[in-house]
Structure formats: C-alpha cells, structure tokens
C-alpha cells in the first residue's frame, strides 16, 4: 500500500455531485436503504468520470494491493467507509478509491482467495491509503508479506483478515496465496531487486541513486 494524495475533482464533475445531493430523488432515499443508495450511485453519480480521476491520482495502481488497474471491468470504485454505512459518504469523492477486482474474474485451478474490496465487502476498516502516518508504517519482508513497522495490530488485522493482502495462513502454518498471486508478485519483485543490488555491488556501482532506481524497477514489476 502507498499513500494517496487526493487531487480533487474538476468543477463540472463537482457540480453534478452537488446537483445529485440536492435532488429530491436523493433526499427521498432513507439512510438505511442500501439498494436505493447503490442504484443512485451506479446510475446518477458520475462514476466513470470519478473513476478515471481516481486512477490518475493513484498512478494506475490499486489502492490496496498496488496491482496495475485500468479503465476496464477489472477495476472498480471502492468506498473506504462502506456505502451501506453512510449515505452522505456514498457520493463523497474523498471517500472513494480505485481498486482491482480482487481476483473475482481469475480462472483456473488456484481457487478463489479474494482480496482487497472483493473480500472486504461492507466491512469497516481503520487502515486507509489516505492516511500518510499509517502508510509510513507499511513494510515488506523477503517473502512478500506486508507488515507494519512499528507494529500496529489494528492495521495488521485489516491487512490480514479483511483485505487478505497476505493470503490465508492455513492450520499447518503454510500460506495460500490470493487468486491474484499477491505474495508471489511481491516476492518475485524483491528477489529481482536483491539480485540487481548484488550485481551492482560486485561492480562497485551500488550508489544511493542506483538503489533508488532498483527499488523503482521492483515496484514497476510488482504493479504489472
């Protein structure tokens, strides 16, 4: 996960959202009518325009797992505070993130270990890619596992139990990766970066600039 800095919406899109919020149709929807709120968000909210801006400000990566996402049916608009929990925040752009499909469309024999929004569903979480202090705690080990440093139990609970960013740990201690192979992708990126660092060190070219470049290449590999 990486810190996401909101850029805001253009005036024309903001105007559409304000118009929706002031409409009689929106005002008539009760706070607990999740179906009606969802229908209004899907049909009356400028969702595609908002999604395009989300992907731009997130540099085309999922807000949770950092996989590459594009303007297609493998990406979606996620509500950080679930749509079912707060009517007003259902159309608040500052409550929205661009995320992947979490492996819902993956085919094959791996099985469906969903992640990100696909597994989170309507669960409320305290971890947020919009929180810079939290994102500065995110770290990765050599096996591709995400953890927090210093340790934050609430964040790790959301990472491991709600978003499933580290797959599922089985009773025998082994880990089953997600359908999107998040752990494998991170481990492969780590291994490539380590090999590049070793090679550069042997050549005497292991400078701070090359370290930064190597980290960037590893991150690009992870996103694809």
Tell me the role of every PLM-derived stretch:
Residues 6, 11-61, 86-91:
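Short, charged surface segments at domain edges that flank catalytic/cofactor-binding sites
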Residues 67-121:
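Histidine-centered nuclease catalytic patch
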Residues 64:
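Short, cysteine/histidine-rich loop/knuckle motifs that typically chelate Zn2+
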Residues 4, 101-203:
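Domain-exit/linker segments immediately C-terminal to small folded modules
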Residues 210-212:
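Acidic, proline/serine/threonine- and glycine-rich low-complexity intrinsically disordered segments
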Residues 214-221:
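Conserved small/polar residues in nucleotide/adenosyl-binding loops
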């Amino acid at each position: 996960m990486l810190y996401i800095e909101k850029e805001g919406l253009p005036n024309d899109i903001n105007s559409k959202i304000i118009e929706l919020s002031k409409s009689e149709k929106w005002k008539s929807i009760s706070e607990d009518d999740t179906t009606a709120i969802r229908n209004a968000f899907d049909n009356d909210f400028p969702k595609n325009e908002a999604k395009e801006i989300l992907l731009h400000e997130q540099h085309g990566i999922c807000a949770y797992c950092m996989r590459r996402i594009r303007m297609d049916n493998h990406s979606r608009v996620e509500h950080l505070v679930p749509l079912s929990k707060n009517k007003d925040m259902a159309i608040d752009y500052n409550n929205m993130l661009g995320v992947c499909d979490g492996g819902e469309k993956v085919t094959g024999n791996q099985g469906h270990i969903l992640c990100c929004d696909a597994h989170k569903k309507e669960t409320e979480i305290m971890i947020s890619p919009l929180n810079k202090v939290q994102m500065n705690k995110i770290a990765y080990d050599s096996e591709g596992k995400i953890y927090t440093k210093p340790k934050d139990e609430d964040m790790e609970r959301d990472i491991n139990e709600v978003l499933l960013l580290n797959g599922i740990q089985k009773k025998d201690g082994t880990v089953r990766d997600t359908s999107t192979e998040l752990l494998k992708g991170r481990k492969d990126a780590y291994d490539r970066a380590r090999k590049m660092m070793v090679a550069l060190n042997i050549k005497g070219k292991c400078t701070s600039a090359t370290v930064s470049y190597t980290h960037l290449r590893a991150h690009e590999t992870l996103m694809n």
